[in-house]
A protein has these predicted regions:
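Acidic, Mg2+-coordinating phosphoryl-transfer loop and its flanking beta/alpha structural elements
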Residues: 193-232
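Short acidic capping loops at alpha-helix termini that bridge into adjacent secondary structure
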Residues: 38-43, 157-161, 189-193
Length: 250
């Protein structure tokens, strides 16, 4: 039986590589420079996925929201104190761009901190490459750091194409990145499968009209992936082959 598919497109953070610690460590170092609250690993999981600027914005917003909540508590007791807290929160939000600049500066050196491919990922991709499959990464991570992380985790030249945030195009879930990637690797939408761990990934695949695999081992939960329309869910990167067999049998 001939195979229906010949290309796999994968997200990076939470799908190919566990980068959670590098993301948290980097943003917390940036937040610390400005005296803002650090974020937890759980917050980091929720905040990432729509690009570095949005990640930083959400992380900064956590401090601002704490101040807004404190202001509400003081409204009846001390209006002046409540006003001051509101002002502080507003000032925090005004510094998002500055925090992002600091984040990007730190991230250049910190992007591979504790970053490792998920168990079974290399084996699964090697098996596909042995069958002649094209393997590409589509990420909202800054391009330079995406390449650095992938080279660190898989070796230089492992991927047929890498699409990252280079500031010249819309990010996922915009499907332009899918079209661009398929053009570069010479494959059609009906011949490829998309693998990711967030609602953004599933939405990208759905908009593009391609099959999707949702990764339960990544940064988001089953409920989010199901609601976002994942075609198949896997608990481990080792299960990618089984998911593809399911699609092949349809």
């Amino acid at each position: 039986m001939s195979q229906k598919f010949n290309a796999i497109l994968l997200d990076l953070d939470g799908t190919l590589v566990n980068t959670l610690y590098s993301l948290q460590d980097t943003v917390n170092k940036a937040l610390e420079r400005f005296g803002f609250d650090p974020v937890t690993l759980e917050q980091t999981k929720k905040y990432v996925g729509i690009g570095s600027h949005k990640f930083v914005e959400r992380s900064v917003e956590a401090t601002a929201n704490r101040l807004y909540r404190e202001a509400e508590k003081w409204e009846e007791k001390d209006e002046d104190k409540a006003f001051d807290l509101d002002q502080q929160a507003d000032e925090v939000m005004e510094q998002i761009d500055d925090v992002h600049d600091a984040y990007m500066e730190i991230f250049k050196e910190n992007c591979i901190y504790k970053a490792e491919p998920y168990p079974g990922m290399r084996k699964s991709l090697d098996a596909l490459k042995a069958k002649g499959w094209k393997v590409a990464c589509i990420t909202n991570k800054p391009m330079a750091e995406a390449v650095t992380v992938l080279n660190h985790a898989f070796g230089e030249g492992y991927f047929d194409y890498i699409s990252g945030d280079d500031g010249t195009h819309p990010l996922k879930p915009d499907t332009g990145v899918v079209d661009d990637t398929l053009n570069h690797i010479g494959c059609k939408k009906e011949e490829c499968i998309y693998v990711g761990d967030t609602n953004t990934d599933m939405e990208t695949a759905k908009r593009a009209g391609i099959k999707s695999i949702g990764c339960l081992y990544g940064f988001r939960d089953k409920k989010e992936l199901e609601e976002a329309g994942a075609d198949v869910l896997i608990k481990s990167a080792e299960d990618i082959g089984k998911a593809i067999e399911y699609f092949e049998a349809e």
